[in-house]
A protein has these predicted regions:
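Glycine-rich beta-alpha junction loops
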Residues: 69, 100-101, 210-211, 245, ...
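Cofactor-binding active-site loop characterized by glycine-rich and histidine/acidic residues
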Residues: 52, 64-190, 196-197
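Structured core elements
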Residues: 95, 204, 240, 264-266
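Short acidic, glycine/serine/threonine-rich loops at helix termini
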Residues: 106-108, 135, 187-189, 215-219, ...
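Thiamine diphosphate
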Residues: 141, 145-148, 153-257
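HDAC/HDAC-like amidohydrolase catalytic core signature
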Residues: 2-39, 44-115, 322
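Generic secondary-structure signature for well-ordered alpha-helical cores
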Residues: 47-58, 76-80, 110, 114, ...
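Glycine/aspartate-rich loop-and-adjacent alpha/beta segment that forms the canonical ThDP
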Residues: 3-9, 246-322
Length: 322
C-alpha cells in the first residue's frame, strides 16, 4: 500500500521543469507544438494514467497507454478546442469510441484545464465526475458517453450530419478513436457505409490497432484482417501508420482535414506502450497495476520525461526542431 500512497502524493506531474504550456486556441496560429514537445506530452499523459489506475485499483491501463501518442497529437496540436469554452459551437469534436480507455482522455482534459489535475485521483470513485467510461453529463470536454463497442463511429457520423444541418460542417471536424473491438462489431461497418453514402467530408476515424484483447490476441478472438482495405472497400480514404511515430501520427491527422471524403487512419500500436513490463503483453487488459508495478512504471516514465525535457530544452537553445 505504501507504493499507492506515494503515487497519490505526486499530483502535479512536475518532477522536472515543464516546457512552454500548450498555447491557447486563439494564440495557436502558425505556432504549433513540435514533435519533441508532443512526445513529451504523451509521456506526461501516460504517467497520469498509471497514477490514476494505481489509486483506483481498476480500469484499463494498457488500452490507455497504446493511445497516448494519438491523443497527445490530437489535443495538443490538431484539435480546435477551448477549455474556457467547452461548448464553443465551432470546436472540433473528439469521440473516444473505445470508452474503456477513458483515463487517457481524462488526462488530456485535465492537463488542458477542463478540470483540476487533482480530480484525476478520483477515477472510478463514487460521486466522481471521472467514471470508468466517459460520461458527457458529468465531465467537461466529453462530447459523447461511450463504452459500448461498435457504437462510436455511428455517433461520429450523427455528429457530422448534425454539424451539416447547423451549417458548420466545413469548419468543425469530427475525430473518432476506435479499437480492435470496435472493428469486430457490425455497427461500425454500417456507419462506414453511411459516411460515404451521405457524402461526409469532416470525419476521421483512427483505429488504435493494438492486437490484444481480454481473452487473447485480436487474431485469436475474432480476426478483423486488413482494416485499411475494409475501409477503402467502403469508399473511405485510408492509410496505415505506426501509431507510436509522432511524425506519422501528426502528418496523417493534419492531412485528414484536407481530404474531401471520410478518412480512416489505421494506427499499428502496442498495448501498454511506454511501460516496459506491460508493453505488448497479454494479461493487463482491465487489470490495474500492482503497487510494485505502478511504482516501477512511474519511475520509468519520470526518467523518460526528464530525458525528453532536457533534450527539448537543448533543441530550443540550439534552434533545432524535433
Amino acid at each position: 500500500m505504501g507504493g499507492v500512497a506515494n503515487l497519490a502524493e505526486v499530483r502535479h506531474l512536475r518532477p522536472v521543469p515543464d516546457p512552454k504550456p500548450p498555447p491557447k486556441l486563439h494564440e495557436r496560429g502558425e505556432v504549433k507544438p513540435s514533435i519533441r514537445e508532443l512526445e513529451r506530452w504523451a509521456t506526461v499523459l501516460r504517467l497520469d494514467c498509471v497514477r490514476m489506475l494505481a489509486v483506483a485499483k481498476s480500469g484499463h491501463l494498457d488500452s490507455s497507454l497504446s493511445a497516448a501518442d494519438i491523443v497527445a497529437a490530437l489535443y495538443y496540436r490538431v484539435l480546435r478546442h477551448d477549455p474556457e469554452r467547452p461548448d464553443w459551437r465551432g470546436r472540433d469534436r473528439f469521440v473516444l469510441c473505445k470508452g474503456h480507455a477513458a483515463p487517457i482522455q481524462y488526462a488530456a482534459l485535465a492537463q488542458h484545464g477542463y478540470f483540476p489535475l487533482e480530480d484525476l485521483m478520483g477515477l472510478r470513485q463514487i460521486g466522481s465526475q471521472l467514471q470508468g467510461h466517459p460520461d458527457m453529463r458529468r465531465t467537461s470536454g466529453v462530447e459523447v458517453s461511450t463504452g459500448s463497442l461498435g457504437q462510436g463511429l455511428s455517433m461520429c457520423l450523427g455528429i457530422c450530419l448534425a454539424l451539416r444541418l447547423d451549417g458548420i460542417d466545413q469548419s468543425a471536424h469530427v475525430f473518432g478513436l476506435l479499437s480492435d473491438g470496435d472493428c469486430q462489431e457490425g455497427q461500425t461497418w454500417e456507419a462506414a457505409i453511411g459516411a460515404v453514402h451521405f457524402g461526409v467530408t469532416n470525419l476521421t476515424a483512427i483505429v488504435d490497432y493494438n492486437h490484444l484483447q481480454t481473452d487473447g490476441t485480436t487474431e485469436e478472438v475474432m480476426d478483423i484482417g486488413d482494416v485499411r482495405a475494409k475501409f477503402e472497400a467502403f469508399g473511405w480514404d485510408a492509410v496505415e501508420i505506426d501509431g507510436h511515430d509522432m511524425s506519422h501520427v501528426v502528418e496523417s491527422l493534419e492531412r485528414s482535414r484536407t481530404v474531401r471524403k471520410p478518412v480512416a487512419i489505421v494506427a499499428q500500436t502496442k498495448k501498454g506502450k511506454g511501460v516496459a513490463s506491460m508493453e505488448d503483453r497479454f494479461g493487463f487488459h482491465g487489470k490495474p497495476p500492482s503497487p510494485e508495478q505502478a511504482a516501477e512504471a512511474v519511475e520509468e516514465l519520470i526518467e523518460r520525461l526528464d530525458q525528453q525535457t532536457r533534450e527539448l530544452h537543448a533543441s530550443e537553445s540550439g534552434g533545432g526542431e524535433g
